[in-house]
A protein has these predicted regions:
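N-terminal soluble domains immediately following signal/targeting peptides that reside
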Residues: 25-133
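Bacterial N-terminal signal peptides
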Residues: 11-20
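N-terminal secretory signal peptides that target proteins for export/translocation
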Residues: 1-5
Length: 133
């Protein structure tokens, strides 16, 4: 193998290592879709909140396949239920919200809202699963 081949092989291996190790440390995000609307949500830290400690819930992207979205007129709500079905939060949603998960268990985060398509608003709802430790 010539010098060019060794450099090319080294660059490929280095790129693969960066991809693998970089992906392991990247913050977690979840994306779900409903009625042509994709919503990406993140819960700090790394989608693994610690019960009893403040976390941030971030709606990082709302992308409709048709129409437009704005937090100003979406009438968005976030409902968080624990594994027993007990609702621990039900309020108007913002792009970033602080929340303390009360105990170590699984939670369902239901994000609802509406997008404008033409002159009408169309509702959507997406569900995310999170486990607090």
């Amino acid at each position: 193998m010539g010098r060019k081949g060794r450099i090319s092989t080294f660059a490929c291996c280095l790129g693969s290592m960066l991809l693998v190790f970089g992906a392991a440390t990247a913050p977690g995000h979840q994306t779900e879709s409903n009625k042509g609307v994709s919503v990406t949500m993140h819960v700090t830290p790394d989608d693994e909140p610690v019960s009893g400690q403040s976390s941030r819930i971030i709606v990082s992207k709302v992308k409709p396949s048709k129409g437009s979205f704005s937090f100003k007129n979406c009438a968005c709500y976030l409902r968080i239920s624990d594994s027993t079905g007990n609702v621990v939060l039900n309020r108007k949603a913002k792009r970033t919200m602080k929340f303390t998960f009360p105990r170590a268990t699984a939670y369902e985060l239901l994000f609802t809202g509406r997008v404008k398509r033409g002159s009408k608003f169309k509702r959507f709802r997406v569900t995310f699963a999170i486990r607090a430790s």
